[in-house]
Amino acid sequence: MTEVLSPITGSVWKILVEVGSQVNDGDTIVILESMKMEIRVKSPHNGKVMELRVKEGDSILEDDIIAIIEQ
């Protein structure tokens, strides 16, 4: 299982997947907002979303776990 981490401190603007979703390498999982910029967090590999640890509107710190993906 792979932990997908936040690359920045900001807030969760939009979640594009659900638990159980199949994702491909490079698919956008969530969109974060920081200083009025949108940052797309992408899947590091093909797999299944096992857990989402954030919800829309959450404030997050750099390196917080966003999701867990099983290969």
Show the residue positions of the predicted features.
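Short, well-structured beta-strand-loop connectors
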Residues: 18-29, 56-66
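Short alpha-helical linear motifs
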Residues: 50-51, 67-70
